[in-house]
Amino acid sequence: MALTAVELVRRSSGIYALPELNSRLNQKLEDPASTNQQIADIIQLDAGLSASLLKIANSAFYGFPSTISSISQAISIIGRIELADLILGKSVIQLFNKSEIDKKSLEKHWKHSLLCGLTARQLTKTIENPEQSADSMFVAGLLHDIGKLLIWMELPDKAQEIFQRFDPKTPNHAYLLEKEILGFEHAETGSELLKSWKLPQVLIETTCFHHHPDET
């Protein structure tokens, strides 16, 4: 029986699971009764995440006149919705950067995904009263090809076959090859992975249909 995208995600769920810290943070972020200090207490358990958050809060993007030195203050500056998106994006990048995919391919993947995320964020800012925040759309762009990483890691021989047969001059050739060789495409794999992480439906759908937007 041929492997499906659902089965591929299920068999690798223990390897590519988001840290427990994410679950705890999301619970607090979604709880209107929680305080910024309670959220900060969880973030401070991860030194790397704490440093990244302070760096972002002190960036020119937020333009705060004085230096932000505490996590709770950084949360106030960034906001809870944006914070959740930033933490998710950083956690996913860290998760796959520990993989055995060669560095050059991984850098190429994240460069493309980052450009998609930045483009999605800018487009969202041009829309009056958008349904989703610009930062949510940034994360959607960042994660849209996440299924490719899982295929590269779990099915390297088939991924190599797809790469060798790929013709960049043929529109949509990569995912058509995936359907032929695997029986499913990276968009299906990615959306199933995001489902297993219990991520927002908008991220699941943008990942699932990014090659078929007319089907959303």
Language-model features: where?
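Conserved alpha-helical "signature site"
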Residues: 1-163, 167-216
